[in-house]
Amino acid sequence: MAGERRPLMAANWKMNKTVREAQDYMAALLPRVADLAGEVDVAVFAPFTCLSEVARMAEGSGVLAGAQNFFYEDSGAYTGEVSAPMLLDVGARASIVGHSERRELFCETDESVARKARRAVEAGLLPVVCVGETEEERDAGRMWEKVSGQVRAVVEGLGDASGGRVVFAYEPIWAIGTGKTASPEDAQDAIGRIRGLLRELRGEGFAEEARLLYGGSIKPENISEIMAQKDVDGGLVGGASLEVGSFLQLVEAARG
């Protein structure tokens, strides 16, 4: 990881945790990360039902409270959706955009993901944009075709936003929740290519400012090798983030 980019370790709780469970988690997490300011950024992406409580508890701590999704319009007849202004209103400062589960289960497209990323930046939310390929696409030699198309769609819609205002998370879909993990070398290959594409599309400054995460069955046993890769700036963590103890191990590993 480049020294000038601060690592980011992000917990994605997915559809887990009640308000009480979220309170207990944050009460255990916050004292342990209080001394990490300036060394590691920590984010917690919570379900909508407990997001306001996570944001309330995180206020002033340096921990980013984030949502797992939102819609790109600010208001209107969009039953079941929430908007960027609504997230800001409850204290969220970031949002995951385009997670593979959203793309697969809820039919999100490169176009809709790009619109969400642009709206997040406009509203002042930090988008964590997920990109990645299926096992079939990888086996067919189409990994880079898929990932580069996803990245291009987002970057071309960002206007003049700086690289520091967007995060990309490479999550090989075949490694999410399966116990399979891309090798550290595979993670670096994909993420290094993404940084190269950002450089091609937006220049050196944008590419060097943007933080690029790895996501896909991250756990304490493999995080150190992954974080040792020069272009990997942190992790988007699913299952291993549900227990505060294991997530703290990942945060400590990112600290170096």
From Swiss-Prot:
Primary location: cytoplasm
Gene Ontology cellular component list: cytosol
UniProt keyword Cytoplasm present: yes
Coiled coil: none
Enzyme Commission number: 5.3.1.1
Chain residues that bind substrate: N12, W13, K14, G177, S217, G238, G239
Active site: H99 (electrophile), E171 (proton acceptor)
Entry's Gene Ontology molecular function annotations: triose-phosphate isomerase activity
Keyword set includes Isomerase: yes
EC supergroup of this enzyme: isomerase
Reactions the enzyme catalyzes: D-glyceraldehyde 3-phosphate = dihydroxyacetone phosphate
GO biological process: gluconeogenesis; glyceraldehyde-3-phosphate biosynthetic process; glycerol catabolic process; glycolytic process
Keyword tags: Cytoplasm, Gluconeogenesis, Glycolysis, Isomerase
Pathways per UniProt: Carbohydrate biosynthesis; gluconeogenesis; Carbohydrate degradation; glycolysis; D-glyceraldehyde 3-phosphate from glycerone phosphate: step 1/1
Family per similarity comment: Belongs to the triosephosphate isomerase family.
Quaternary data: Homodimer.
Purpose of the protein: Involved in the gluconeogenesis. Catalyzes stereospecifically the conversion of dihydroxyacetone phosphate (DHAP) to D-glyceraldehyde-3-phosphate (G3P).
Database matches in PANTHER family: TRIOSEPHOSPHATE ISOMERASE
UniProt cross-references to NCBIfam families, sorted A to Z: tim (TIGR00419)
Protein name: Triosephosphate isomerase
Native species: Rubrobacter xylanophilus (strain DSM 9941 / JCM 11954 / NBRC 16129 / PRD-1)
Taxonomic lineage: Bacteria, Bacillati, Actinomycetota, Rubrobacteria, Rubrobacterales
